[in-house]
Amino acid sequence: VLDACPFPSELRVSQVVTCLRPAFSQWDDSLFGGLIARFGINSNTKMKELSRGMGMKLQIAVALSHGADLLLLDEATAGLDPLARDEILDMLQEFVGDGERGVLLSSHITSDLERVADRVVGIDVGRIIFDAPRETITDTAGIAHCAASQVAEILECVPGARVVKREFSCDVLVPNRFEFAQAFPEVACDRANVGDYLHFMLKGGR
């Protein structure tokens, strides 16, 4: 599933299906028809008449209708209104609900990853900068807020910590905020999110 609908602009939805059906031995017309009805897509609509959200939903309907076990999505929710994003994310969760299928989602919208991802991989200029279960980031990691004078002690005591210096203070990403709270009870430490984690892994230092 690409970030732009790849089908020729003059083709109608029904013609796209006619072209794709012979290519997939497990193509399911009934499933496809149900999906486009759910999405409000008319089979006579031309590709050029579809909004970006509708084009994305059409691609996903196609992907779900030929027995795929793994969906590959490139920025599937970028540029969509909140309702369309929610609908696509709900559908992806339904797809993996049986535990037998998977989704590989490329996205810059970190809140979407928090909602649907089991594992998050951060990539910068082709280099993997972290690879972690989502709950390790959102349920365990934390952002500590401290004075510059406290940073050296924290970095010495907390393996894997990364610091970002502010104008009058410092923020430190810590791998386990519960252990950190026991070691430094006087330092405020908040729950991290995927966006925080990515920022600190890119910009933070030791």
PLM regions and their residue ranges:
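ABC-family P-loop ATPase nucleotide-binding domains
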Residues: 2-59
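Short loop/turn segments at beta->alpha junctions
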Residues: 12, 133, 190-193
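Conserved catalytic motifs of ABC-family nucleotide-binding domains
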Residues: 67
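Catalytic Walker B motif of ABC-type/P-loop ATPase nucleotide-binding domains
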Residues: 71-75, 80
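Helix N-cap at the start of a conserved alpha-helix in ABC-type nucleotide-binding domains
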Residues: 82-84
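ABC transporter nucleotide-binding domain
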Residues: 89-174
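C-terminal coupling/interaction segments
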Residues: 162, 166-206
